[in-house]
Amino acid sequence: MAEIEVWRGSVAAWECDAMGHLNVGFYVARAMEALAGLAAELGMAGAFAPEAHATLIVREQYIRFLRESRVNAPLSMTAGVLAMDETEARLVFAMRHADGALAACFQTVVVHATSREARAFPWSDRARARAEALAAAIPAGGEPRSIALAPLATQASRERADALGLAHTGRGVVLAEHCDRFGRLRTEGCMQRLSSAIPHVFAQVGRPGGEADRGKVGGAALEYRLIHHAWPRAGDRLELRSGFGGGDARFGIVVSAECHKAHLAERRLAGSVRPEHADLGTGE
């Protein structure tokens, strides 16, 4: 892929989960910083500034996790453009350790839109020219493994979740400090809420976690696909519903939906889980 570095940093202790690994929400936070860097390379250096008239809105994000990142791990990210149409683009971000090993790979679909109304409009000729220069391929090992990226027609709703018997795994309200400059819940905030719900998912299958289970059973995300259908704003109440969508003794797929302002996510987990069935979406 194009070796355009768009982010460099390290892992702080407070960003790690109970297993000592960088929490998935902070992977996404890094990817959003990297998106700002790539936006600058496309000629949109101020895309996320308060006064911006045009911005990039994440519509979909696929993440493949390949190697854990622990406290003080030095990391960097490169980025490029996989495809661009009239108003959208599919971008690729590769997060690497200092030794060059791939830590995670992101495919992010963004919409070129007005910052306040989120109305899509065509890319500029300058951005298209830069996109051609930044054309990239998915790095080896970063390809999707178990989650298809075909178009998805969501059925996510509170009624659908009730019909499937999905567990209540999160409730809350969007706070102003969790929103971006344009008043929308930040992308990493969606992932952080999904991550926070996972202990409740395991509790449903008899593994409540906590101090008593420390060191016994753990889980690690292998893949995510998140599709954003609407963006909650400050004051909006959220409800998260989750369930197992399939798997075996070692792997499971957790399907979650944030109701009211629906989001859809598939998460493939490594761990000891009991698979059940849930279906919130159908491929087209």
Name the predicted role of every residue range:
Residues 1-59, 111-223, 281-284:
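Hot-dog-fold acyl-thioester-processing enzymes
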